[in-house]
A protein has these predicted regions:
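Histidine/acidic-residue-rich catalytic or RNA/ligand-binding cores of hydrolases
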Residues: 100-104, 148, 177-178, 230-232, ...
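His/Asp/Glu-enriched, well-ordered alpha-helical/loop segment
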Residues: 108-110, 254, 258, 322-323, ...
């Protein structure tokens, strides 16, 4: 629905704006103040719905939230009184800076294009994520090293539209591993940015992490098992050793960086947890022992349980090689069943989709699968808001609608706690106080 915007409080009274938005003591008037009238507001910290709330925003941040807040003269009013308002969504596993979607594993995809071409191709990816309601993403690796750093900074400057990004800069991977560009003849020398994160042995791992820290990354992405969409890789295999993973976590800690670890295999998952990573990505073949370990250590799992649909569709369209489909055989259902077990066990789970496997802007499709496989709609919403902010270490900045936090706000018609599929098509998006979609 279209929002109704007015700038004069007296006009609001005459127009019949709800009484719950008119009483109370107003803060000082300011042309920078925006007032959102929320018919329903999802309190993601408490896991409950509040009725008839006013959100006062000054600049980029929320100033006050509550019933009966007066709207200062001159404020811009956004009437969402017939909608449900919730914090901007967070996808904790994306790959926005890799250009156009390509899951063929063909190394020529990267060798035919300059870094500049890939960067320009990636701009629509960021916009699609933002306009689908995701105001923050944790971008966990780019084949073109540091393209994600440049994209993050361009968004922060306002040069391009996109979500707030937390980036990894590159993949920390073994030679020929799940994060390496494979299928290249041994006498071909790759450009530096196509093998930037390769490391073998604990000291090389530390060296790579030191480089990435110097490059200004927000986190480290390391891979402890093979991958599905990678030539010559096997998701059941172990890649980095426990010793190497521990070195990564230790070195990252020196720079205040958290570690996300790709792991499909049972042992790869356990090694990642033992090493002390912040999150295990995919966690496909986690067993009961691994689930117990994750719960005991407070390790987050980020399980992309919607991707199977996109991989199958791409396979039918011959857009994915047969060996990739062989890797994927039965893994999707195994991952979903293990997701259900993790939910039942009370393991920390954060929302992440591996955006780029499925088309950018479709991350919201995963919510229905999370509910189908064990979460309540409120738990699914919390996984993409308060839990995701906790995983990122920024609960003071976003993840709930609270004074002092960024004004990252989305709204839907209807109640997503009753119908979580409403989050597949979000009609109102605000990031840091600026409306991008209404």
């Amino acid at each position: 629905m279209k929002t109704k915007i007015s700038i004069a409080f007296l006009i609001l009274l005459a127009a019949g704006i709800p009484a719950w938005a008119q009483s109370g003591t107003a803060p000082a008037a300011s042309s920078q103040v925006t007032a959102i009238l929320a018919g329903r507001l999802i309190d993601t910290d408490a896991g409950k719905i509040l009725e008839h709330q006013v959100i006062l925003i000054r600049g980029e941040r929320i100033e006050a939230v509550g019933q009966g807040l007066a709207i200062p003269p001159g404020a811009k009013v956004v009437d969402l009184s017939k909608m449900t308002v919730l914090p901007g969504l967070i996808d904790c596993h994306t790959h926005l800076a890799d250009g156009t979607e390509d899951n063929t594993g063909d190394p020529l995809t990267y060798l035919k294009k300059t870094s500049a071409e890939v960067a320009f191709e990636s701009v629509p990816n960021a916009r699609a994520m933002l306009y689908s309601g995701f105001t923050t993403v944790r971008d966990v690796g780019a084949y073109r090293a540091l393209n994600d750093v440049a994209m993050r900074d361009a968004i922060a400057r306002g040069d391009i539209e996109g979500p707030r990004m937390f980036v990894a800069g590159s993949y920390v991977t073994i030679t020929g591993g799940a994060g390496a560009l494979t299928g290249i003849a041994p006498d071909i020398t790759l450009p530096w940015n196509l093998h930037y994160g390769e490391a073998n042995g604990p000291w090389q791992v530390r060296q790579v992490i030191r480089k990435l820290a110097n490059d200004g990354v927000d986190q480290i992405k390391i891979l402890s098992s093979g991958a599905v969409l990678e030539r010559g890789s096997n998701p059941n295999s172990q890649e980095f050793t426990l010793e190497e993973l521990k070195a990564a976590v230790d070195e990252a800690g020196h720079f205040g960086l958290r570690v996300a670890c790709h792991a499909h295999s049972t042992q790869g998952i356990k090694n990642a947890i033992l090493a002390g990573v912040t999150s295990v990505e995919h966690a496909t073949m986690i067993d009961d022992e691994g689930i117990a370990m994750a719960k005991a250590r407070g390790t987050y799992l980020v399980m992309d349980i919607y991707d199977e649909e996109c991989i199958e569709a791409a396979g039918k369209a011959n857009a994915i090689p047969p060996d990739f489909l062989a890797h994927d055989a039965n893994l999707g259902q195994i991952q979903r069943d293990n997701f259900r077990k993790a939910v039942a066990a009370g393991v920390k789970l954060a929302f992440g989709t591996d955006a780029g496997v499925c088309p950018y802007g479709t991350s919201g499709m995963q919510f229905a699968y999370m509910v189908k496989y064990g979460m309540s709609p409120m738990q699914a919403i919390q996984s993409t808001t308060s839990a995701a902010a906790d995983l990122l270490g920024h609960t003071d900045e976003f993840g709930s609608i609270r004074p002092g936090k960024f004004a990252d706000i989305v709204a839907v018609d209807g109640d997503p706690v009753q119908n979580v599929r409403l989050l597949e098509n979000i009609p109102f998006v605000m990031k840091a106080g600026k409306i991008y979609k209404q």
